[in-house]
Amino acid sequence: MRTAFRALSTFCLISSCSLSVLAQQRSAGDQPSQIRYLPPTSQTYLRFASETDSMLHRDVLDVWFPRTVDNENGGFYSMFSRDWKPEPSQGKFSVFQGRMTWVAAQVAIHHPELKDQFLPIAEHGVDYLNNVLWDKKFGGFFWGLNDHGAITDSFTDRKEMYGESFALYGAAAAYEATHDPKALALAQSEFRWMEAHAHDNKNGGYFEILTREGEPIQAERIDPAKPQKPEGGFPAGYKSMNTHIHLLESISQLYEIWKDDAVRKRLEEMLAIVRDKICVEPGVMNLYFTNDWRPIPDHDSYGHDVETAYLMLEAEDVLGVPHDPKTERMAKMLVDHALAYGWDEKLGGFYEHGTTFGEVEDIRKEWWVEMEGLNALLLMHEKYGRQSDIYFNAFQQQWNFIKTYQADPEFHGIYPMVGPDGIAAEQNKGQNWKAAYHDGRALMNVSERLKRLAGNWQSVQLHSSAGTD
């Protein structure tokens, strides 16, 4: 059935028939026996909201905080074993530091009962970003430093826009939570540094790898005798999907707190680049590009597809232009394609990656992919649930997968990687690339959206009852 569906989906995913074809794929014979799908009612929404709230506390907030706070060296400590014991340090990485600052700020904003606990943690994160990670001599944030704030051979002294983006993200969120002028000034300084040094005024977007002084590093001719995998996966002299979707994310966060015309212009540019250059029919994304935006062949990342659907829709809301047809259409195509090609019919969950129309190449399940998938599926249900139950049913199966296989029932927290049999393939709970960001954001977003859906459902029911009197 999957092969036949794929041939048909090539023609259908970009049209209105995508939902009906997806429904055909979810025939009775394909349904996992352990799932009993619940109808989208207020009671159902509130039940799932309660469950996601419980996981947010048990498997994210209670295990990460305050043990991640480094009171000796500043910032946040990243390395933890399965049972949450500290492991040898990887240093202080800009991505991890920005993400943990953002999480603490968002908890303080969205959970008033926890504000007294998390506001000081957000302030702690900003202090590290401002006092240590920010380059006092040349501006911009270091890609990473050792625990004592010194430049290392592994991180080098370079600046990478992926890290710049998350440091900006954390500083902007911290200002929203704390109203500390220092956090706003840091976010503004970073944006101005990005504009002066990294923005590509000719082709749009940003140069991604820069020297400490802020000069873009150009691509080097490949030497077959010395193949090199770039640190972090970002090759110098090229542009990437991954960096630019997170620049869209961080500039969205910045524009929420600073309604500056230059920030709005850049946010509009980032949304157009992600939607119109990086995303392509039938709902996939190119991963790498030359500086003038010519795509470089690579695989399709299902997790980035569903995450980008959410980030584009978030950006249009921040810009005050919700329901833009081009953005909505592309966001839906990304999720539909991931469901069609990257979805595990048996256990639920999105696979790691594959090709646009071919077989899945990596059938493992990574924590951030599953959490972003949960968030995107409920968002699609909110927008298109009246047309089909596909998204809400997939949301329920996704949630069942996360509860059953991704969460650790003994020591709590989320396993980083699960194999095709549902058994944890990796068990460490923290490292520089695994913060509380993807799972924390997804669970907070999903809980809030479920409660909103429950309220809307009740309003519709009351309105319908009043109309029949």
What are these regions (language model features)?
Residues 1-11:
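Bacterial N-terminal signal peptides that target proteins for export
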Residues 9-20:
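Bacterial N-terminal signal peptides
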